[in-house]
Amino acid sequence: MEVTIAGILERDLSEGELAEAIRGLREHGAFRGEGLPAAMSGLLSSCNSRLTSASSRIEGLSLLALAVEESPTDVFVQHCVSWLRSLLQIIQSQDPPRVVSLAVFVLRSLLAHSSALPELSREISTNHIPGLLTSLLGLRRQCLVPALEGIRSCFLSYPRACGSLRGKLTAFLLSLLDAENQQIQEVACQCYSLLPSLGSGFSQGIKHTENWERQIQSVICSLHSVFLQLYQGSETDTARYEGSGTELEFPSVEDDGTHGVLQLARRFTALGQCMRLLLREQFPAPVRVPVSDILSLVCRVVNVSPKNLSWHGEESLKLLLLPRVHSSILEILEATIIACGPRLLPFSAVICRLFPQLLLSWAAVKGITGIPSGQERPYSSLRCSVYRVLETWVTTCGISSGVLQGPMHHSDILLANLLSDITPPTDAIKMSTFVQLGAKKQKVSEVGDDDFQSHRKRDNTANVELCAAALKGLCCVILHCGSVIKEDVHRRLQELSIPLLLRLQQGSDQWLGPYISSDCRKELYRLLLCLTLTPNPKLPAPLHCAIRIFRGGTTEESLQVSRFSTEALAICRILIHPRVPSLQRPLPHLAPRPSVQSDAPTLRPPAALSTFPAMPPANHLPPRPTVPAMSTEPPIPAAVPSPPPEESFGEKPRRAVFIHFDKEEPSDVEISLESDSDDSVVIVPEGLFAKSDSKPEPSPPAVKPPTEEVTEQVAPSAVPSSSTAAPPPPPPPPAPPVCAGPSSAPVPIAEAPPPPQQEVDTVININSSDDEEDGEEDEEEGLYDDEDEEDYYDEEEDEDLEGLEEDDYDYEEDEEGITEEEEEDLEEEGEDDEEEVEDEECLMPDEMQIGSEAEEIPDGIETSSLHEGELEEGPPRLSPVQEDEAVDTGLLMLVESEDREPSGEAPGEGLPESDLTRSPPQPPVLTPPSPPDEPPPMEESDVPPLEEPDLEVAPVAEEPVEETEEKKPEEVTVEKPEPEPEEEEQIADADAMLADFVDCPPDDDKLPEPCT
């Protein structure tokens, strides 16, 4: 490689051949590899030898440009200062402008690379930049463009070092803003926009910010002054500049005639470009844009329209220059929109009014309506500028831009101009029916020479840019604001775009104007896609038509049109037939729900539905932490507020009801409403309560969780008395969540309406009977009824009966626990009427009455068993209990509607909380019964503290459990008239269905003892 490089450099190559050789060396990276110091040294020696000779200086500069770009860092640092001096000598010499231009080109690359090296940049900024700027300012007029390029490079790479020459540089640049050479004017404007960043910015660039704000105010003031001189006497608006800026020191305009008007027009255009660059260029410090002053200037310029000027005298020249002035002011508006963005929304009404005002003012000029097809429309460049700014405004502010949404007049004008610019021209044939009598018949060759020409001169590129700009602006408006645009606008656009695209695909012989260009056809396809994606809510989207048209567009001869049609077709197809579920953010996994029999009717409240319930999306994203169905925190008293809604999936908190026996048996049943299966009957395994006692969960020190010992001490007492009632009932609760626990999955039975919203837990003890083997059956005899709730039960009877059908297989097993003697007693005693039977079918599991409803309780009858029958209407009355019902069935629980309230609790009752349930372990609440007619609503946080007031205990509480159960039917039995035959059948049916409600499939851990 070294030999090849040396051979190429030693040859005498022409400028073109040397350029090709340098391009090849750079492509191969010949000087970037390691171990090539000889090649780099050969390049540097060849470069220095050619720079010393004036005849080969161009070749030397070309090799120097290659060395600056390809040299490693150490070589660059070593030779950078010497290269800079060589370039400065070439700039100060009287070399041709071409050599000076090439030297400035190498200088720009050298300054850009050296500014990134701290040590080198410090030396150059201190010792070389001021002299370099002085040399550039002294170049002759033929080298103004290279000089300005070099000055701009110094401003960008070493702005701090250029601050000492700010005044001289400002005067030099202002003198060039009126230059007739457009290239000089553009570079001078670029340099002028960088003046505020020169010098030291002090703390946090405060000096830079002040310089920028002062300079932009000076530019605005100068624009007002120049416009006043240019169109004095033609303005109808009396607005003037009231800012803090001072006019720039331009040289005065000597000629008041045509030359003066042209000079003022060039100055106005240059100042507008300076303002645009001030707003668009990156600045090292935050600045404040004077939006009000800028918009006032824009409105003042736009208000001067062609109707204010005439085509005679000096005003004709001003009228010719007015489109250029308007285009310049539109560039300022576009730069302001880009710089400020949505902060301009308070001025949206003013900005939206500018577009139709400009389009309408230039469309009303005389003589522009008779332009034949195939010719460029007048003021097309100005209209393109309007559509470009419109697209920028809508893209920046979106649907808040207000385009085509404001006053009907302005929206209609804008839409009409857009449609006229995207509609292809048509040839109009004028037919005349007037025939002069006695006139000579014309020859065919003489007909239509002026009115009908099938072949005329046309420009195939005419109005292509205008049509493309209008389509882009319209696509942007429809895409961002299509859903709020009027229905009529959508209909008109559909009626225009769809037939036109079909004509284009069919290859119509008619000339279609700008749609010969592939850019216009592509934008027309894009308009149809935007109409499909953002339709009006009251108008159907052209989805199916779009699919057909896009399918035809895939065969377009233009590659960009076919590529876009393929993309649009894929979008439309996926709208109609999604292939797979879309990727979603990680969702919490719900706790597993127990299996429910398919034929069981449910009244379960709506749960959180997934986007694809049938087939969950197989996301590869990691799932979020699961939201527990039940709180895993230690149990808290009922007075503490309920868990937040997100822990119960947005539902209301549940109220748990537990049924504990004085003598825990392996077959005991614990029923909890803290389950998302609405009703869960869980068979508690043997030893579960013992485990929970050994591992009590923490609770607040003020309230001690009930223990089994307390229950055993209170167990000898009789059935709870009526003096004990539940606290004031809160609102009804919703359906329970999943009950997580160590035991097997609960077997769901009949669905229940949502329980009260916030209620305290209720623990009810039911004493066992004489025969322990029939312990489940004798507790069922008196758990259900209350005459005050029968109205609601009538409404819920049908739903509960449907829920009971799923447990038909339990009825046969439950019949085994009913003896013949019990059946005879049931036929003899008919104290339960039809309404009481309905009540038995609808009771909630947390409200347990003993026996059926009794109309009257004789004096002297023990009412201690009313503890478990307290409802929100007041203390219930005991119903007569037959002797045979004591051994009827096992534990029987029915689910009431959501209006039912919890029953009372006996003092000291309850067992320590097991892992199966998460109800707060609190002592039973003993409060007086609530009034029977006005149940006060009560939130969970308002529940009074747990107390055990001194209440009278019936004497029967001192008797043993067996004796209490034996005497119980005699004490509460009240003679009643025999029921009718229909009532007997209803009682039998109700007993059968109530029996189905109790027995459940055995637990996975341990089978319960069979009922006898």
UniProtKB/Swiss-Prot annotation:
A motif (LXXLL motif 7) lies at residues 317-321. A motif (LXXLL motif 8) lies at residues 415-419. A motif (LXXLL motif 10) lies at residues 529-533. Expressed in oocyte. The keyword Cytoplasm applies. A motif (LXXLL motif 5) lies at residues 216-220. Gene3D superfamilies: Leucine-rich Repeat Variant (1.25.10.10). A motif (LXXLL motif 4) lies at residues 129-133. GO terms for biological process: cellular response to estrogen stimulus; positive regulation of transcription by RNA polymerase II; rRNA processing. Component of some MLL1/MLL complex. Forms a signaling complex with SRC and estrogen receptors. This is Proline-, glutamic acid- and leucine-rich protein 1. It comes from Xenopus laevis (African clawed frog).
